């Protein structure tokens, strides 16, 4: 039996963090007797998340970690290459102030960095209840699970959808 739970008006705003909605839903379900140790927030905009990734994240949560998120390797838009652009004169300068970014001539020399893929945010129910909209609520020691390029596809724009459709056909995904 599927039960529809509508967002209350205070959570139905454009800038409402999704974690606020997840927290509200988990608490409301707990009031009805559906209590869970963990809550997995799996983005529908990341349609290629693998079952084995979800199972791996659940195992990590069961080992006592209170937050596990999916990460992707930063390849092309590396933070060391980020620039600030002066719109008046079109001059640009490095965004990072405390790093000598000019010494990293080749991208292979750049430090290996990761960012959240947006696919999965998994938290203990205890941690989720503490969410206060002042940070991402990742706990003191968040754990990252690196996903491949296909799993990291996140559909936010039309071009992302077109790319996901192309990859789906090319690799016969789902």
Report the location of each language-model feature.
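Conserved beta-strand segments of alpha/beta enzyme cores
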Residues: 3, 141-143
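Active-site catalytic microenvironments for nucleophilic, acid-base chemistry
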Residues: 28, 60, 167-170
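Conserved core of the sugar-phosphate nucleotidyltransferase
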Residues: 20, 24, 47-138, 146
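Hydrophobic helical membrane-anchoring modules
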Residues: 130, 144-174
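A short acidic, often aromatic-flanked loop/helix-cap motif at beta-alpha or helix-coil junctions
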Residues: 10-14, 75-77, 150-153
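Short phosphate-binding loop-to-helix
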Residues: 1-40, 48-52, 56
């Amino acid at each position: 039996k599927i039960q529809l739970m509508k967002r209350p008006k205070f959570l139905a705003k454009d800038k409402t963090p999704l974690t606020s909605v997840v927290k509200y839903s988990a608490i409301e379900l707990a009031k009805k007797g559906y209590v869970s140790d963990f809550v997995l927030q799996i983005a529908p905009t990341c349609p290629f998340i693998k079952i084995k990734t979800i199972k791996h994240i659940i195992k990590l949560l069961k080992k006592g970690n209170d937050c596990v998120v999916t990460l992707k390797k930063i390849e092309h838009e590396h933070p060391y290459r980020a620039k600030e652009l002066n719109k008046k004169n079109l001059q640009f300068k490095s965004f990072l102030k405390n790093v000598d970014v000019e010494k990293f001539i080749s991208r292979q020399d750049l430090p290996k960095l990761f960012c959240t893929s947006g696919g999965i945010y998994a938290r203990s129910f205890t941690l989720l209840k503490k969410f206060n909209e002042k940070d991402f609520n990742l706990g003191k020691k968040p754990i990252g699970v690196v996903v491949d390029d296909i799993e990291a596809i996140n559909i936010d724009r039309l071009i992302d959808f077109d790319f996901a459709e192309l990859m789906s056909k090319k690799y016969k995904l789902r």
